[in-house]
Amino acid sequence: RFPVNDSNKTSKIEPRPDSDIQFFQALLEGIASIEKEAYEKLHELGAARPVRLYTAGGGSNNPAWTAIRSQIIGTDIVQALHSEACYGSALLARSGYLAANPA
């Protein structure tokens, strides 16, 4: 439930627009807004604000989704060189391993 830990928080999908396209766009904008809140929360906790975000996975191939995220978050979003989502996880694991096991 990051960035807001509230088990009583309810969904806000009503009133639903008549247009399925408008409804879908609103859902994507809502998801991007939550992502923005997450970066803001991380900044409150001491992390630097992102200057550029790298995106991976299936959604990274959707230019409309990338544009929505970029506009709402307010930063450049570029497709990662390796677009499989697991690649980032592997890099984080490697980084953690190297930090715990210096040469």
Which residue ranges define each predicted feature?
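Activation-segment/catalytic-loop signature of the eukaryotic protein kinase fold
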Residues: 1-91
